Amino acid sequence: MDCHLSILVLLGCCVLSCSGELSPQPSNEVNLLDSKTIQGELGWISYPSHGWEEISGVDEHYTPIRTYQVCNVMDHSQNNWLRTNWVPRNSAQKIYVELKFTLRDCNSIPLVLGTCKETFNLYYMESDDHGVKFREHQFTKIDTIAADESFTQMDLGDRILKLNTEIREVGPVNKKGFYLAFQDVGACVALVSVRVYFKKCPFTVKNLAMFPDTVPMDSQSLVEVRGSCVNNSKEEDPPRMYCSTEGEWLVPIGKCTCNAGYEERGFICQACRPGFYKASDGAAKCAKCPPHSSTQEDGSMNCRCENNYFRAEKDPPSMACARPPSAPRNVISNINETSVILDWSWPLDTGGRKDITFNIICKKCGWNVRQCEPCSPNVRFLPRQLGLTNTTVTVTDLLAHTNYTFEIDAVNGVSELSSPPRQYAAVSITTNQAAPSPVMTIKKDRTSRNSISLSWQEPEHPNGIILDYEVKYYQKQEQETSYTILRARGTNVTISSLKPDTTYVFQIRARTAAGYGTNSRKFEFETSPDSFSISGENSHVVMIAISAAVAIIVLTVVTYVLVGRFCGYHKSKHSAEEKRLHFGNGHLKLPGLRTYVDPHTYEDPTQAVHEFAKELDATNISIDKVVGAGEFGEVCSGRLKLPSKKEISVAIKTLKVGYTEKQRRDFLGEASIMGQFDHPNIIRLEGVVTKSKPEMIVTEYMENGSLDSFLRKHDAQFTVIQLVGMLRGIASGMKYLSDMGYVHRDLAARNILINSNLVCKVSDFGLSRVLEDDPEAAYTTRGGKIPIRWTSPEAMSYRKFTSASDVWSYGIVLWEVMSYGERPYSQMSNQDVIKAVDERYRLPPPMDCPAALYQLMLDCWQKDRNNRPKFEQIVSILDKLIRNPGSLKIITSAAARPSNLLLDQSNVDIATFHTTGDWLNGMRTAHCKEIFTGVEYSSCDTIAKISTDDMKKVGVTVVGPQKKIISTIKALETQSKNGPVPV
């Protein structure tokens, strides 16, 4: 450290000053001796007496200080000693000596080259007692001290001297104290100050742990120090630090954390303010009280709920206080005989919680609603009575013609803590006539080798007049894979044609006007052993009889297959009171033959849908969003994750709340239809949900939606080959349906779905119906909506639908595809379309439509349905076009495509017309002749100038004839210029 010393050497006195600023003493240094701080004389021992001399001066702050100097440079063999007083070492083991001094350059003193020195020696001696007599040999040399800078005569003249600072280590020291000694051997030196100190690691707080002053033990190792936690904190990991020999703290390990109700602020743990809390020990900060809670004092670990607000026992303190929800709203009941479906809306006020559930309280009431009692334990709730998470429940097994009141409680996690009354909504209903209860016992009366006679008691609760009983039986070993159903009017029956020595399983259920009751439990009975054997004398007779029977059966089956009269089951009358039906898996099927079964023939739609569709667990279905609304409810997109299978995207149709039984039957009917189809161009049914609400139909998800919307969105973006590929897929799907004997009735581009690979699939089977046994027979509808613009003339006129009428609709779909989703007959009303089609008007070819495709459209639009191609032929035609793309380059001529006009399939030669009447007859608009007779448009020349408004004035108001006449007029103009043009 360089400072400047201004000194006056006069009569042994000097004044010291320093032009530089002194650094403050570090906090980790503890002084044992500092000569500058001693008031008065230092009193150190100087030997010999004419050696070191104590003088007074002032420092840079003009504070008086005592210093020692010596300058015996003229004499040889100088040995001047200066010893300090005894210095206690306290706890130090290693001490540091800091010397500040000035030293005269020997070269600046004349005649002293042989005797002048520029160094002095530093010594020390340990001692347990002070007052020890000075003896040179007892001291141990620490070091020889030399000046970094010395002063000259010139410096003396300027009174500016340079101050040197040197620090030396001493130790380890073991005794209670020590002396320092300075030996001069002939230098001109002044000791400005002497400071003796040791280093310590000072008190500090680290990681909320306090570490005390610590003195290093030796010069080699670190001292491990255990910290103690500050107030209102506790150890998380034991806090430790290491004190180095340089008095520095190193390597903090572990820490303390503030207690609950306190947070770290600097080096302390401070209590949370009112309105804030901290629930647990740790480094977290105090948090503001959650809604509807507060604190009034410092250091709170949780917040108290406001009046009428609560926090459940397991709720974390950070959760807002809540209250019970309000009552459910908009309760709707849908009664079905002795069951009821209850639907309701969520409470307006959830109380601030999401864990809302619903409990159903059932009460059976007399005609006076106030006189009620709890319902019988036999009443069932689906999915359950308590803890419902959805807003619907089905209640079954109610008594017929009985009043019930249902109270729907809304509860959440704090409802049990609240004292206010229950929050519920109530609805009262009266049940209708119910199906009969099960037959409880079946008794075996007689048994033979091939028959069993059974009897049973009427159900305990018939709930009406028993119409008949259904007896279902099958061989036990077949496990219900093939069963027989027999109907009986009484409570007994004899089943014959059984196998000897065979166990059969029987179930019986009763039927009333309200429908079938549930099946009885299963009863097992065994026929008698077979004691009959074929002897030698009659074996040939038996073999002939068996052969004849087999031949008759085979012939009967073949006949049924050829005429298409096989209906899935065999009927035969056994008596006036019994009917027998035999099923294989519910329907008898022949290898290689797949026939569509109309689900509407089933009395119970649920039985039909379970026959053809897979029941899904609603928990495996997740709904993402609502994408539209259908006839029966919402249409959603979502995901289906079946066990051991990959999650797939699906479309979900739901049955709306408050449905009628007919709507439910139609809804499940559509699923029963789809479930019978398995073709890459038919929408695939993934399954149904009928055992929970809402009921759902789950199908594969088609990313691009309906074909018409998709084409409009991507107008003119596909090649002709791509469009033909789409059409080929639709035709292939329709061929599959036709082969199954199935009529769609609503084939349109809006009912074709397209996926991301541009694969088209037929969908929407809401209007579909089954064909009769004759493949060319028609199903006559009983009314309902018909899509006029897509429907064939015979279907519009006579309500008769066949596969040929589907071919007509396919022609319209073909037109929609080639026009990129335009609406057919877009400028015409439905009535105009019906009249125009009946008069043989047809849609014009779309822009740039290949002639081969337009010809296929016209073939599909033949008035005689027998002249239309079959779907098999359409698939073949499209395959040929795909294999020969050059044939698609021939575009329909402009002459055959008047702009925005319908095109008559008949070619009219205008040159053959001589009068207006001939012309109108040629266009099949003879009914307009009387209108034009007697008016100014009585000749071809005058009528060529007619406009649409002019036709309306004279009475031609139907759009079809209007457009036909205008089209022919344009052709007439072309004829007058270029010759005849076909129209």
Curated annotation (Swiss-Prot):
Q: Which residues lie on this side of the membrane: Extracellular?
A: 21-540
Family, according to the entry, reads as follows: Belongs to the protein kinase superfamily. Tyr protein kinase family. Ephrin receptor subfamily.
Q: Which residues form the Eph LBD domain?
A: 29-206
The UniProt function text for this chain reads: Receptor tyrosine kinase which binds promiscuously membrane-bound ephrin family ligands residing on adjacent cells, leading to contact-dependent bidirectional signaling into neighboring cells. The signaling pathway downstream of the receptor is referred to as forward signaling while the signaling pathway downstream of the ephrin ligand is referred to as reverse signaling. Highly promiscuous for ephrin-A ligands it binds preferentially EFNA5. Upon activation by EFNA5 regulates cell-cell adhesion, cytoskeletal organization and cell migration.
* UniProt motif PDZ-binding: location: 981-983
Reactions mediated catalytically? L-tyrosyl-[protein] + ATP = O-phospho-L-tyrosyl-[protein] + ADP + H(+)
Q: What is its EC number?
A: 2.7.10.1
| Active site (UniProt) | 746 (proton acceptor)
Give the species: Mus musculus
Question: In what residue span(s) does the Protein kinase domain sit?
Answer: 621-882
Q: What is this protein called?
A: Ephrin type-A receptor 3
Q: Where does ATP bind?
A: 628-633, 653, 700-706, 750-751
PTM statement from Swiss-Prot or TrEMBL? Autophosphorylates upon activation by EFNA5. Phosphorylation on Tyr-602 mediates interaction with NCK1. Dephosphorylated by PTPN1.
**CDD domains from the UniProt entry:** EphR_LBD_A3, FN3, PTKc_EphR_A, SAM_EPH-A3
Q: Identify the residues that the record assigns to the SAM domain, covering every copy.
A: 911-975
